[in-house]
Amino acid sequence: MLVIFLGILGLLANQVLGLPIQAGGHLCSTDNPPQEELGYWCTYMESCKFCWECAHGICKNKVNESMPLIIENSYLTSCEVSRWYNQCTYGEGNGHYHVMDCSNPVPHNRPHQLRMKIYEKEDL
């Protein structure tokens, strides 16, 4: 009975967080999170390459329409994300990790915004 209750509680927690239901609520380390989770991951680490769609060196954010177009290599980082119980982790590919409680997320965008180059038509 307790196991069933805990299972239901875990499913409800994922729905509240906006995360899809997966085995145990876990997400193995990936650089390509499920499409339905992009809104969550890209809010708290918007410089991850998987958050952007790029063509001809110009990139548009897949989730946040208010983000400006950017030059491809100025801001984007190769990220891997994972979730284990209530710990969400961003691995930036350079040995830096950002770990947070999934239910109490903290943005980690500021260090990367300093390198962002916004696309201007004159850049062509």
From Swiss-Prot:
GO terms for cellular component: host cell endoplasmic reticulum-Golgi intermediate compartment; virion component. Its main location: virion. Disulfide bonds: none annotated. Glycans are attached at N64. Induction: Expressed in the early phase of the viral replicative cycle. Keywords: Early protein, Glycoprotein, Signal, Virion. It is found in: Virion; Host endoplasmic reticulum-Golgi intermediate compartment. Residues 1-28 form the signal peptide. A motif (Prevents secretion from ER) lies at residues 121-124. Causes the redistribution of lumenal ER protein to an enlarged ERGIC compartment. Belongs to the asfivirus MGF 110 family. This is Protein MGF 110-4L. It comes from African swine fever virus (isolate Tick/Malawi/Lil 20-1/1983).
